[in-house]
Amino acid sequence: MPFPDIIGMCEEAGRPDMVYEFASTSKITFAGGGISCMCASKANIDYFTGVFGVQMISYDKVNQLRHVLYLKDRATTLQLMKKHAAVMAPKFRMVLDVLDQQIEPCGFACWNKPKGGYFVSLNTMPGTAKRALALAAEAGVTMTDAGATYPYGKDPQDSNIRIAPSLPPVEELEKAMDVFCTCLKLAALEKLLNI
């Protein structure tokens, strides 16, 4: 699904320097070794060109070449993304189904239903995200830290949990989601009862 041209929209609105867009191949090529890019107004690009020039002597040209050889062109990249979708879709479907069945009836949390990407963002009762994940960890389920989507991981509400279902096989993921949902309910119950 194409994104709106927000850079062009800002330019039309007379605010061309308002937005910086960033993208990375880290989740689609080599985890932790992807390449990134930035899109912005000419003035913002000129500014960052000066900043980048001071920060580094040279870009990792070997890694850039590796990506060019691997991704080749738009068609190859789209084919790769279809392969990713074939692997990821069942995992996301299962995560969302478990949340719908086990958490939605309780009414204390909400989450996005992504049409792409690699995460489900869940917002639970304020003050319970860290506790829910601590309980899950005690039960053997490791997840991304609470508040990971916030700068420095500091969620002022202690309510956001980013679910990243890409690694485990569906069967393991389903068991992990059962444990997670139980811990999420227990943390909410503790909060409601002031335990």
List each language-model region with its residue ranges:
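Conserved PLP phosphate-binding loop immediately N-terminal to the Schiff-base lysine helix
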Residues: 1-7
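Conserved core segment of the aminotransferase class I/II
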Residues: 10-89
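PLP-dependent enzyme catalytic core of the Aspartate aminotransferase-like
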Residues: 14-15, 154-195
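Short beta-strand segments
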Residues: 21-23, 37-39, 112-113, 119-123, ...
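Short, solvent-exposed loop/turn elements at beta->coil junctions and helix N-caps
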Residues: 23-26, 108-109, 147-152
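Conserved C-terminal alpha-helix-loop-beta "cap" of PLP-dependent enzymes
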Residues: 45, 49, 119-162, 170, ...
